[in-house]
Amino acid sequence: MIKQLTVIFVMMGLWVCGAQSDESEQHKERKQMKVIMKTSMGDIQLALDAEKAPKTVENFLQYVKKGHYTDTIFHRVMDGFMIQGGGFTADMQQKPAPEKVENEAANGLANATGTIAMARTMDPHSASAQFFINVNDNTFLNYPGQDGWGYCVFGEVVEGMDVVNQIKGVATGNAGPHQNVPKEAVVITSIDVVADGE
């Protein structure tokens, strides 16, 4: 199977006023759209930036609403780099993820600690469902990156960074052709959109 993240070690009057206010509120709602990721090690809440990465957020939410992430795992964990998940089950079976998204890494968002970005193959527009959470400031992944594209950031952890830090420290090993796989599965039990007021 193709490894998802290729990295070289060493993204008019009162009516007008009213309309602008409505647009401002809608803009605010988009900026503050959140999801909660429940894992076997605790909850992680993420704020998604639909203003700067609209296609990526839409694609991610489509997978969320379909329940794609339920019972997937963090299958690649590298302390000092990132934790990657959303594509495999605990028995390392890859889930089908046919919908791809255009690379939006040139959106000004950096692969800083605590941000979430899309994993992909060497094809810059191959991102589908797999994502990773940066546990370091991975500036080499930012647009234009080493391949002229970089990796698209589309949100950040707003609660539960302690959980991310626990995950990054788990013991890992090999599972078939896959490296850096947690020896004890870190399961994503669900990802859901956070309701207003939560």
Feature-to-residue mapping (PLM):
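Cyclophilin-like peptidyl-prolyl cis-trans isomerases
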Residues: L5, C17-E198
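Hydrophobic h-region of N-terminal signal peptides that target proteins for export
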Residues: V10-G18
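Sec-dependent signal peptide recognition
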Residues: I2-I8
